[in-house]
Amino acid sequence: MPRSSFSPLPSNLPDGAERRALQLLVVDDDATQRSLITVAAKQAGHEVTVAPSVAEAIEKLRTARFDCVTLDLVLEDGDGIDVLGEMAKAKFGGAVIVISGMDGKRRSAARSFARSVGIELQSLPKPLDLAALRISLANLGKTAMGLPAMHTWGGVATDAIVERHRA
């Protein structure tokens, strides 16, 4: 059986600091995308809950606490913007990573809406760049502990990867 080519990112944690698993909600109606995101997050040591629809996402957000939500913009029963609206009403304080096949203009509109309701988000296009997702999750874990985001992938700073996918 071939070995996985995935190796965890170095922690860059100060001595004595412990990594904390993020509570992640994956909202995507595409089973393959949900699986990819779930596997990457679990490999990084995070706890994952999935919601394949707007209705399930809203229900899970009402009944559990999440550090981060990955969110597709187009779902069978509605729009990811609807989920962002519900998150704003609930004063969601976690991170949001939009992962969508929609064009940059639509992802930018989602980011603008999110900012207008007090939510900051990152945006990654489909097909998903797993390295960028892993970096984003690693940095979220660090910032949740009050540490600066420091991870890079292949010598490229995280901010450069995320900025490349903005707009």
Per-segment meaning from a language model:
Residues 53, 79-82:
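Acidic catalytic/metal-coordinating carboxylates
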Residues 76:
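The feature encodes the CheY-like receiver
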Residues 82, 86, 102-123, 135:
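Alpha4 helix (beta4-alpha4-beta5 surface) of REC/receiver domains from two-component response regulators
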Residues 1-25, 38, 131-167:
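Non-catalytic signal-transmission and effector/linker regions of two-component phosphorelay proteins
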Residues 45-52, 60, 124:
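Short hydrophobic/Thr-rich beta-strand motif most characteristic of the beta2 strand and flanking loop
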Residues 28:
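Conserved acidic carboxylate
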Residues 13-16, 31-49:
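Two-component/phosphorelay signaling modules centered on CheY-like receiver
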